[in-house]
Amino acid sequence: MALKQISSNKCFGGLQKVFEHDSVELNCKMKFAVYLPPKAETGKCPALYWLSGLTCTEQNFISKSGYHQSASEHGLVVIAPDTSPRGCNIKGEDESWDFGTGAGFYVDATEDPWKTNYRMYSYVTEELPQLINANFPVDPQRMSIFGHSMGGHGALICALKNPGKYKSVSAFAPICNPVLCPWGKKAFSGYLGTDQSKWKAYDATHLVKSYPGSQLDILIDQGKDDQFLLDGQLLPDNFIAACTEKKIPVVFRLQEGYDHSYYFIATFITDHIRHHAKYLNA
């Protein structure tokens, strides 16, 4: 599958690149960002996938989070896809910021008119890793995933739905229980229809209750002054309770004074890279 390089910038001895390709799952052209640390010049490196939140593209994380120095030091290839299909000309996809374009919610849609293109779950867990493994110096056996908000939800469900696939998972201010929050209800009813059992298959709090897999060490940072936490969009307490019940280790850090922004992410990104490096470089 042909990759078209859009940009390449040297950063902390490595290269931050952006590529475009024709996605089979999403039936459209997609961009993704990939950081190749200096270590990638001489051998295969672990792959760490970042999933962004609502309204984002592949650009937000690479320009705002300040992750490069840490990824360079730990020798991690970091991949950041877009958050939805683009340019599909589906009626209604650009009407609101929390549904459609920029809001794929990392599910495989089952409803018309979304089901042909809105297959971000399969894109992130299958198509993109295959593309990365085939075209970049990564070790396919060593991959982890993390994300923010909608992307934190995405990271948690990808790890919980695929035991053993990811070595570790972490999240910043994830949407932990989407079946119960306004964002989740809107997205899931649109993409997945009215059958709520289908919703639960993409809800981290429900998935953790039946998680059969290998031990997962989960790290979550949450800003205490996050407006969306206060608005009941994120519901981390429900997820923590489910993890505690299942004896799944989760480190949940409520960070005093921090909000939902990339300033919050930038503050704690090094901790998250270190968390993943511990497992990826073991």
Curated annotation (Swiss-Prot):
The modification N6-acetyllysine is found at K200. Changing H260A: 3% of wild-type activity. GO terms for biological process: formaldehyde catabolic process. Gene3D superfamilies: alpha/beta hydrolase. It is found in: Cytoplasm; Cytoplasmic vesicle. Belongs to the esterase D family. The modification N-acetylalanine is found at A2. This is S-formylglutathione hydrolase. Changing D226A: 4.3% of wild-type activity. Keywords: Acetylation, Cytoplasm, Cytoplasmic vesicle, Hydrolase, Serine esterase. It comes from Homo sapiens (Human). One of its GO terms (molecular function) is carboxylic ester hydrolase activity. InterPro entries: AB_hydrolase_fold (IPR029058), Esterase-like (IPR000801), S-formylglutathione_hydrol (IPR014186).
